[in-house]
Regions:
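A cross-family "folded-core" feature that marks the main globular domain of proteins
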Residues: 1-197
Length: 197
């Protein structure tokens, strides 16, 4: 417990609250995961069917940086005061999270400035692909797998290739198609401006 408190900067009371919250959320989502806080030790118990991506998703869902990235996938831009209000944080806190996030994004030659992505479109998509490949929960994967348009895309690609895709290849295709679809949708007005010129 001491090492976790030092690493996170949480008080023991805050850590206890987070452990309770995570356990409740795991139970609500049907995830076989429990964090035990016993004396001065933390212990993680996971079921055999629990996947790493489900654990990462559980921990990240309410993280501010994660929510910023998800917001920008589905929206072209944000105004700081509106996003801060939506995330229920101060603008100063949002600014600190954006600064920290930009340090991470610099590895991809990307940044978020004035509420918008800055960087090459292919890098933005590649970043989202690498990121969501690790953090999408099994439920999210399954939800996208069941969409008729995704099933059709898989069938079409298998027909063109003359081979069946593995489950991993199908998941990669579904993720890439989802990211591309969202990026095209949020950038539609930019493409319209280019077409008009």
């Amino acid at each position: 417990v001491k090492a976790v408190i030092e690493e996170t900067g949480f008080s023991k009371a805050t850590l206890t609250k987070y452990v309770t919250l995570l356990n409740d959320r795991a139970m609500d989502s049907g995830l076989e995961l429990t964090i035990h806080l016993e004396d001065e030790n933390l212990r993680l118990s996971i079921g055999a069917a629990t996947k790493g991506r489900d654990i990462r998703s559980l921990f990240l869902e309410n993280a501010v940086k994660y929510q910023i990235l998800v917001y920008l996938l589905y929206h072209q831009q944000f105004l700081a005061h509106q996003l801060a209000q939506e995330l229920m944080i101060s603008e100063a806190t949002l600014g600190r999270h954006l600064s920290s996030l930009n340090q991470i994004l610099s590895e991809f030659d990307l940044s978020i400035q004035n509420g918008r992505w800055r960087g090459p479109e292919h890098q933005i998509r590649y970043f989202y692909f690498c990121f969501f490949r690790k953090v999408w929960s099994s439920q999210e994967w399954e939800g996208h797998m069941q969409k008729p348009e995704r099933k059709q895309e898989i069938a079409t690609l298998e027909e063109i290739c003359g081979a069946s895709l593995s489950s991993g290849q199908k998941l990669d295709l579904i993720l890439w198609a989802h990211i591309s679809q969202q990026r095209l949708r949020v950038n539609a007005c930019q493409f319209q401006v280019i077409e008009e010129k």
